[in-house]
């Protein structure tokens, strides 16, 4: 049926049909004639929808329905537009005077009974200004008795949500009551009264005794538990490779970053950086490199660095077989290039005597000029047996006695470069640069040295073919007092707690063993990290190829222990507790390569694979976001 075809209602009344048929002339019906049916009957339309009677009227949609806000709409800006457009009228539209609005920052983060944002100010819209102007012409100034009497009955209904006091404040700020060029709203951020200002860990101390939080102990709390109050501060990712060493000067005004260097086309500047905390600047120091066969610079891995005790110089060692001295402005002051192989480790005495461990098996002692940084003298530390066996000097530390460095130097040897797990631990006299003794340890490759900052002991870890071992040594007798055996095949870090009682061993298995030195036979705790973020070949022994835990730090002057593993997570522990885990401090995108506190515990630097460096600081106001350092001109040296 076409659109022009008339619609004929069908009748089923037989009497009506009989009366009509009696009046029509008799004709022969040709049922095969389609035109006959088209003229007398409506052709069936399958798409025709008959209107059926509705037994119940439809219900209207509620007028309070709220349209769904698109996901790309800024809800905060949308609310401000609604508040100032006059189309959205809350129960209260308060007005703050201009003088008070200049100090609204003092109201932020206020404590309220709920966690909903509070509306504290809404500017008068142009429509409201015109209403006030008309009322002023009729009833006089806003701050008058006649206006006040008329407000509740004649004016308030036209200004929903406005109090008479709001109009008074607005007249003081704007005597003409004329519309302002820009108008908006102020919403106060709030938080609940029961929000945790301190972690549950500290809350437990508070419940145990409030004297812990008395005024004279607040400084001790911040020193010992500062990791809970550290906030994101700076992010940096311009290094040449993975950052493997970080140093702070004693005043915590400067810092330095040392990174690995890549081979071939990926080798680039950025292996050594020095930064300033106050000016928030950082610069690259270009000097640790070698010239290849075609005369191009190939930058070397920075293996270790440290600042002088007098805050004047930075000492750096690298795989270019050199030790270099820099001033605080990044100027090169001295070079020691006598070593014939990689520099592995640096150590500094309280008198700024520098000790160096080299891959060729030698140790070196360097004295520098206190004013210019020039290297004045050098002496070799030689253990003949280690040289004969081809050991590498991989560790070096000045011995400590009750918080002061002594004239004794400890060197740890290994033979990893020959795929051998052999080595030893030796003692030297720095005053005469002479060998004193070999420690009574097994001939095992030593992997870490940790000198207690204020006690009379230190720990050294070693690897055997099947397991690991940690030795606890006394600096008064220079003998092994205790040893702890672990199933770890490769130990990255061994440490002693600030109390001198707890000993830890962190390895490539992404675990840390903890012992009580009073009961050395059995581990006290086992601290575990999660699944590694490093990529390994199928079938590889993960413990042999994974980086494991590369960060094992005690909170300075405190009891907290902080670890960072190849799962990219930095964890905080209190090893005095039965359940030592406290919280995850942060999570990086890849495996942790280094982490360390500043001496005053006000800074913490965490580095991961790929070169990312995150710095956390006390007292910053970055809104939990990382800022950036300003990079200044490189020091180009030849």
From Swiss-Prot:
Matches recorded under Gene3D superfamilies: YVTN repeat-like/Quinoprotein amine dehydrogenase
Pfam entry (one): WD40
Assembly and binders: Component of the Clr4 methyltransferase complex (ClrC) composed of at least clr4, rik1, pcu4, rbx1, raf1 and raf2. The cullin pcu4, rik1, raf1, raf2 and the ring-box protein rbx1 are components of an E3 ubiquitin ligase, whose activity is essential for heterochromatin assembly. Interacts with nup189.
Positions of transmembrane segments: none
PROSITE patterns reported for this sequence: WD_REPEATS_1, WD_REPEATS_2, WD_REPEATS_REGION
SMART domains the UniProt entry points to: WD40
Keyword vocabulary terms for this entry: Chromatin regulator, Chromosome, Cytoplasm, Nucleus, Repeat, Transcription, Transcription regulation, WD repeat
Keyword match Transcription: yes
Residue ranges of WD repeats: 297-336, 486-525, 544-583, 587-626
Primary residence: cytoplasm
Name by which UniProt lists this protein: Rik1-associated factor 1
Subcellular location: Cytoplasm; Nucleus; Chromosome
GO biological process: CENP-A containing chromatin assembly; meiotic telomere clustering; silent mating-type cassette heterochromatin formation; siRNA-mediated pericentric heterochromatin formation; subtelomeric heterochromatin formation
Gene: raf1
Cellular component annotations (GO), alphabetically ordered: chromatin; CLRC complex; cytosol; mating-type region heterochromatin; nucleus; pericentric heterochromatin; subtelomeric heterochromatin
Role this protein plays: Component of the Clr4 methyltransferase complex (ClrC) which contributes to the establishment of heterochromatin by specifically methylating histone H3 to form H3K9me. ClrC preferentially ubiquitylates H3K14 and ClrC-mediated H3 ubiquitination promotes clr4 methyltransferase activity for the methylation of H3K9. H3K9me represents a specific tag for epigenetic transcriptional repression by recruiting swi6/HP1 to methylated histones which leads to transcriptional silencing within centromeric heterochromatin, telomeric regions and at the silent mating-type loci.
């Amino acid at each position: 049926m076409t659109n022009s075809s008339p619609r004929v209602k069908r009748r089923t009344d037989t009497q009506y049909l009989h009366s009509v048929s009696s009046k029509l002339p008799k004709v022969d019906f040709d049922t095969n004639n389609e035109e006959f049916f088209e003229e007398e009957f409506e052709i069936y339309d399958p798409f025709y929808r008959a209107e059926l009677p509705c037994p119940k009227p439809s219900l209207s949609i509620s007028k309070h329905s709220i349209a769904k806000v698109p996901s790309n709409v800024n809800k905060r800006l949308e609310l401000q537009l609604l508040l100032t457009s006059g189309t959205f009228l809350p129960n209260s539209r308060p007005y703050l005077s201009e003088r008070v609005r200049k100090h609204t920052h003092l109201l932020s983060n206020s404590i309220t009974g709920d966690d909903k944002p509070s509306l504290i100010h809404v500017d008068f819209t142009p429509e409201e200004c015109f209403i006030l102007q008309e009322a002023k012409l009729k009833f006089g100034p806003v701050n008058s008795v006649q206006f006040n009497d008329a407000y509740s009955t004649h004016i308030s209904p036209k200004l929903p949500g406005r109090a008479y006091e709001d109009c008074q404040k607005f007249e003081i700020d704007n005597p003409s009551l004329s519309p302002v060029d820009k108008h908006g709203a102020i919403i106060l951020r709030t938080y609940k009264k029961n929000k945790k200002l301190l972690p549950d860990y500290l809350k437990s101390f508070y419940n145990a005794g409030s004297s812990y939080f008395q005024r004279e102990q607040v400084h001790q709390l911040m020193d010992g538990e500062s990791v809970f109050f550290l906030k994101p501060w700076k992010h940096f990712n311009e290094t040449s490779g993975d950052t493997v060493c970080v140093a702070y000067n004693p005043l915590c005004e400067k810092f330095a970053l040392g990174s690995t260097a890549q081979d071939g086309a990926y080798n680039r500047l950025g292996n050594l950086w020095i930064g300033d905390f106050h000016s928030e600047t950082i610069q690259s120091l270009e000097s640790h490199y070698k010239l290849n066969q075609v005369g191009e610079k190939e930058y070397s891995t920075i293996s270790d660095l440290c600042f002088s005790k007098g805050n004047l110089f930075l000492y750096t060692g690298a795989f270019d077989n050199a030790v270099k001295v820099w001033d605080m402005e990044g100027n090169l002051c001295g070079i020691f290039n006598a070593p014939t192989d990689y520099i592995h480790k640096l150590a500094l005495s309280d008198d700024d005597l520098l000790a160096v461990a080299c891959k060729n098996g030698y140790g070196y002692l360097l004295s520098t000029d206190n004013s210019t940084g020039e290297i004045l003298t050098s002496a070799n530390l030689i253990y003949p047996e280690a040289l004969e066996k081809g050991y590498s000097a991989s560790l070096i530390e000045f011995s400590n006695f009750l918080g002061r460095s002594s004239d004794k130097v400890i060197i740890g040897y290994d033979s990893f470069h020959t795929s051998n797990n052999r080595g030893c631990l030796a003692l030297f006299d720095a005053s005469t640069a002479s060998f004193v003794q070999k420690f009574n340890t097994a001939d095992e490759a030593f992997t870490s040295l940790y000198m207690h900052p204020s006690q009379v002991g230190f720990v050294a870890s070693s690897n055997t073919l099947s397991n690991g071992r940690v030795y606890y040594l006394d600096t008064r007798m220079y003998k092994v007092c205790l040893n702890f055996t672990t199933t770890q095949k490769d130990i990255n870090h061994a440490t002693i707690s600030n109390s001198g009682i707890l000993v830890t061993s962190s390895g490539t298995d992404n675990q840390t063993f903890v012992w009580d030195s009073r009961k050395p036979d059995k581990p006290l705790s086992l601290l575990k990290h999660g699944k590694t973020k490093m990529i390994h070949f199928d079938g590889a022994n993960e413990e042999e190829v994974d980086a494991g835990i590369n960060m094992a730090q005690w909170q300075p002057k405190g009891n907290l222990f902080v670890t960072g593993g190849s799962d990219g997570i930095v964890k905080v522990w209190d090893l005095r507790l039965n359940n030592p885990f406290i919280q995850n401090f942060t999570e990086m995108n890849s495996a942790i390569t280094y982490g360390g506190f500043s001496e005053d515990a006000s800074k913490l630097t965490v580095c991961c694979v790929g070169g990312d460096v995150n710095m956390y600081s006390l007292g910053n106001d970055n809104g939990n976001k990382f800022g950036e350092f300003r990079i200044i001109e490189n020091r180009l040296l030849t």
